Regions:
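Immediate post-signal-peptide N-terminus of mature secreted/exported proteins
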Residues: 33-64, 153-168, 172-175
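N-terminal, post-signal-peptide region of Sec/Tat-exported proteins
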Residues: 52-89
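Acidic/His-rich structured neighborhood in mature extracellular/periplasmic domains
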Residues: 79, 83-174
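N-terminal secretory signal peptides that target proteins for export/translocation
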Residues: 1-11
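Sec/Tat signal peptide C-region and signal peptidase I cleavage site
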Residues: 28-32
């Protein structure tokens, strides 16, 4: 049969590497979480790329202050890259997982994501995570949804519900906003200090609107991300995500992502003061 022998060789190497990662993950018990096994976990599940993609969220920081990146001058890009350093964020993620990820969770997730289906999912998820133009991605996702059979739409909805089975997304986004805005206020980035109680009350008023916005955004993102996969694969993914152990894994991974994002936004706010005069919120 035809085909590029170099590409075939590359696929063989990739599967050998994957087999070694899986062997490392399941070979030994997780005591105080072996760092090498956790690093393998980041790779086989794609969670490492998900952590790296947090850096792309830095572009939203000025908007939360009613400003744009250009308001912070030429130093903005350098500052954002320093604060959202991917190596630092992976280290933070590993430190949290080291304390919270147990044997059952690690083994269960690793076994699924090392499967043929799991690796197809990781491939498309990694590609979507690293796509920098969120507006273009959402527009394409919405266009796909408009022409999509309702049956597939419902499977994507079920998938998104399973990814955040604890329903923490809205509260997490609110907490990130609170921590960032308070840090910006304390650092003098804003002209006047923010009252935390008033800020939380204001965010609570918009909670329903935020929930719908996040739901619509997640659905468009799923339509874009999984467009190349058949509905049978998506149904199998939903079943895997709904397993109680996988639900625990995702609850932890979501918490890790949210904590790292909130922490980095706090650090960013503290360092933004040197880039611009005080601004009103």
């Amino acid at each position: 049969m035809g085909g590029n022998p170099l590409r075939s060789y590359g696929r063989g190497v990739a599967w050998v590497a994957l087999a070694l990662l899986l062997a490392l993950l399941v070979a030994a018990p997780l005591r105080a979480a072996d760092r090498a096994r956790l690093e393998a976990f980041l790779e086989v599940t794609g969670f490492g790329v998900a952590l790296d993609s947090i850096a792309l969220s830095a572009s939203g920081a000025p908007e939360m202050l009613g400003l744009s990146a250009s308001d912070f001058g030429q130093g903005w890009s350098t500052l954002a890259e320093e604060v959202f350093d991917t190596g630092r964020m992976r280290e933070m993620g590993l430190s949290i997982l080291e304390q919270a990820l147990d044997d059952e969770m690690l083994g269960h997730a690793a076994e699924f994501y090392a499967s043929d289906l799991g690796q197809r999912l990781v491939a498309v998820e990694n590609a979507a995570h690293l796509h920098e133009d969120d507006d273009a991605k959402r527009a394409e996702g919405e266009a796909l949804l408009a022409a999509m059979p309702q049956e597939r739409v419902e499977v994507l909805r079920a998938m998104n519900a399973a990814v955040d089975s604890a329903g923490t997304g809205v509260r997490a986004v609110q907490e990130i906003q609170v921590r960032f805005l308070l840090a910006a206020s304390y650092a003098g980035v804003l002209e006047s200090e923010i009252d935390e109680g008033m800020l939380r009350a204001l965010l609570a008023e918009g909670e329903d609107e935020l929930r719908e916005s996040l739901r619509a955004s997640a659905l468009a993102s799923a339509a874009y991300t999984y467009q190349s996969l058949p509905i049978e694969d998506l149904r199998a993914y939903v079943a895997a995500l709904e397993h109680p152990t996988m639900a625990r894994v995702y609850e932890l991974m979501n918490a890790v992502q949210y904590e790292i994002m909130a922490n980095r936004f706090e650090v960013l706010a503290a360092r933004m003061r040197g880039l611009t005069p005080a601004q009103e919120l």
